[in-house]
A protein has these predicted regions:
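Transmembrane alpha-helices and adjacent helix-loop boundaries
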Residues: 1-227
Length: 227
């Protein structure tokens, strides 16, 4: 127990880095995923093909490979072209996590949009709204509510996936645990503490998304008022 208490400040500092990485990745991933998800429904087949190729690539290859590809691969490519280019660990980590997350969020967005009844599109069209206005004012607000549970799952998955950026030396929670074990050699105690912190983070944010889902559900609000 003494070893865990002594290591706790370093592990908590790593946990903060983990949360920051996750928040940035889900933010950029949501922006990219929304664009990709709507593009997947485009009437233009080249757009659909390009977005599907992106999604299949990032969903079909290991995240660890993608991290190495971005952090080591791109600088090597630029060097072969005679250009001096290096990636900051933070930038590479956020980019890899964001690009990967965008591929999964794209399918969440696509599913959310397609879950809206076709009659609502037709009703909006009869009111004089164009496709963009219909998407913005009618479809997306409803689809977003339905996306909250899978987005919550993606967020908790990302928290765990951040541990992979330890391979490029980014000192998030898992990397802090590794460095601590390298100094005190108490692998069982430290990695147990690391696992429990990950669990606590996931439980906390899972509960937050559950609350958000209830808040965004009009039927739940009506029930509360009725009670």
């Amino acid at each position: 127990m003494e070893y865990i208490i002594n290591a706790l400040p370093a592990l908590l500092k790593g946990a903060i880095t983990t949360i920051q990485l996750t928040a940035l990745a889900i933010f950029f991933g949501f922006i990219g995923g929304t664009l990709l998800g709507t593009a997947r429904l485009s009437k233009l087949w080249p757009v659909r093909f390009a977005t599907r190729a992106y999604i299949e690539f990032f969903r079909g290859t290991p995240l660890l490979v993608q991290i190495f590809w971005i952090y080591f691969g791109f600088p090597a490519l630029f060097k072969s072209l005679g250009l001096d280019f290096t990636f900051d660990r933070w930038a590479a980590g956020v980019m890899a996590l964001s690009l990967n997350s965008a591929a999964y969020i794209a399918e969440i967005v696509r599913g959310g949009i397609q879950s809206i009844e076709r009659g609502q599109w037709e009703a909006a069209s009869s009111m004089g709204l164009n496709s963009l206005q219909t998407m913005r004012y009618i479809v997306l607000p409803q689809a977003l509510r339905r996306m909250i549970p899978p987005l919550g799952n993606e967020f908790t998955t990302l928290i765990k996936d951040t541990s992979l950026v330890a391979v490029i030396g980014l000192e998030e929670l898992f990397r802090r645990g590794q460095l601590t074990v390298a100094t005190n050699f108490r692998a069982f105690e430290i990695y147990t503490a690391v696992g429990l912190i990950y669990l606590a983070l996931n439980l906390f944010f899972a509960q937050g998304f559950t609350w958000l889902e209830r808040w965004a559900d009009p039927s739940q609000n009506v029930k509360k008022k009725g009670a």
